[in-house]
Amino acid sequence: MKVLAIILIVIVVLAILYFLMIMPRMIHKPDTAPFKEWLYAHRGLHDNATEAPENSMAAFRKAADAGFGIELDIQLTKDKIPVVFHDFTLKRVCGGEGKISDYTYEELQQFHLCDSVEKIPKFEDVLKMVDGKVPLIVEFKIERTDLSLCPIADKMLRAYKGMYCMESFNPLGVWWYRKKHPDLVRGQLSDAFLKEGEYVGILYFVLQNLLLNFVTKPDFVAYNHHYPEILSRKLCRGLYHNTAAAWTILSLIHI
């Protein structure tokens, strides 16, 4: 009986710890309602086989003209200029070698997006073009523990007059905003990493199951829509009434 009691106590303690670890922001929450009134064009309203490829000025212009909010990705060049580009490497979209961070902004202008006339845009230029017409979801692309993107991009965003929020797969980026600008709507991106098969290890178990929410305290969780069964995601939405976002939906049947 004593052993059974100890086992039950351990189970209860672990369960309590789990619920505390996945808990998103519960108090002093900014209003997320205005963001829920929109549908968002992921990387702009794009088609990589056209002259409006992903994360291009043309794709963002099309999205704004069609009345869609815009989701986009930002990262730093070698000379610390925020540009809009999804992958850390150039290969898939531009056919080039190396990473965005291996090149200065001027050097990146030799590359075209998906064989179109479009080139990698500066984040600053995208902000000027959108000019508050539609809301922005800004994904911060952060490798490992390098948070230098956060203060540089944040300075631009603080001067921007339109509606925006931030999100990141890297919990350190979300944590940075929790500490520096708690007034801003912030989101934790995640995926069923272990089920995808590309990632292994304890880190991806932690990220998949949102076990750092107690550190980042996100206002919303954006999850791969193919995995609605992930328990932590369901609990965040159902138990804690945390705003849920889904990526990337290509058909109305998935809404």
Model-identified regions with their sequence ranges:
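Phosphate-group recognition and catalysis centered on beta-loop-alpha active-site segments
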Residues: K2-I253
